[in-house]
């Protein structure tokens, strides 16, 4: 990555770069049961899309009157990573159209590329690796245990990008790409550009209504996406 990169691009993972079709959620529920025994753990009525893993953990613990201290959280993350690693095979991970090509094209053009995701760091890297992305193409990011809400993750990602590249980025040159209104919100709250993608549960129209600067069905139009992001 060019240390003089003018553009920073931060990708969400689930519903944006790839889909695991429920495997991640199932692995998380098994991890709760391994940690605390069968208690009927369920995400029924909980909006998973755009949620932070750390927040889902805290919510589940509170719901069942269980401790959510740091040691328990660390143990849960280990068990969840183990469950996910066993369940996640290339056959259950679907890469979204044009994503690998876009990441490569942005890097080739000298843009800095990172992650901004609700996934824990370890499981984020696990998902993108199994999906066939080069993990080294995302050398920094903000993850699901880095703050209490997605809006808190944006400054973390910007700080880590600055630390990695040795310079700060103008938020107007930062594009956050995601598939939920939470992704749009965490961009706009910090003066960044928001690119909504309809490969998750929300249509491009819904993402535009949430404040996206641009919303598309998918990222397959490589010249169009590259031009808009770097423009």
Task: Set out the residue ranges of the language-model regions.
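Active-site neighborhood of HAD-like aspartate-dependent phosphohydrolases
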Residues: 2-49, 55-58, 62-63
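Short, acidic loop-to-helix structural element flanking the phosphoryl-transfer center
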Residues: 5, 10, 85-115
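Substrate-recognition element of Asp-dependent hydrolases with the DxDx(T/V) motif
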Residues: 99-131, 141-148
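Short acidic-hydrophobic, aromatic-tinged amphipathic segments that line or gate anion-handling sites
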Residues: 142, 214-219
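Conserved Lys-Pro-Asp/Glu-containing loop-to-beta segment of HAD-superfamily phosphomonoesterases
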Residues: 153-184
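Acidic, Mg2+-coordinating phosphoryl-transfer loop and its flanking beta/alpha structural elements
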Residues: 176-214
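Short amphipathic alpha-helix with an adjacent loop that forms part of the alpha/beta core around
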Residues: 222-231
């Amino acid at each position: 990555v060019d240390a003089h990169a003018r553009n920073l691009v931060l990708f969400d993972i689930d519903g944006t770069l790839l889909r695991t079709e429920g495997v991640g959620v199932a692995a998380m529920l098994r991890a709760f049961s391994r940690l605390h025994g069968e208690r009927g753990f369920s995400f029924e009525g909980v909006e998973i899309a755009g949620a932070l893993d750390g927040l889902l953990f805290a919510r589940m613990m509170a719901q069942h009157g269980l401790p959510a201290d740091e040691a328990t959280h660390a143990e849960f993350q280990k068990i969840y990573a183990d469950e996910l690693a066993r369940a996640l095979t290339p056959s259950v991970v679907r890469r979204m159209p044009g994503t690998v090509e876009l990441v490569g094209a942005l890097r080739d053009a000298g843009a800095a590329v990172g992650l901004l995701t609700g996934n824990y760091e370890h499981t984020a890297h696990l998902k993108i690796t199994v999906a066939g992305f080069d993990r080294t193409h995302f050398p920094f990011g903000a993850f699901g245990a880095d703050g209490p809400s997605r809006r808190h993750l944006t400054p973390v990602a910007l700080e880590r990008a600055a630390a990695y590249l040795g310079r700060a980025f103008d938020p107007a040159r930062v594009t956050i790409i995601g598939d939920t209104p939470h992704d749009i919100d965490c961009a706009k709250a910090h003066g960044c550009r928001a690119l909504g993608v309809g490969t998750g549960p929300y249509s491009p129209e819904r993402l535009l209504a949430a404040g996206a600067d641009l919303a598309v069905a998918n990222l397959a139009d490589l010249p169009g996406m590259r031009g808009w992001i770097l423009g």
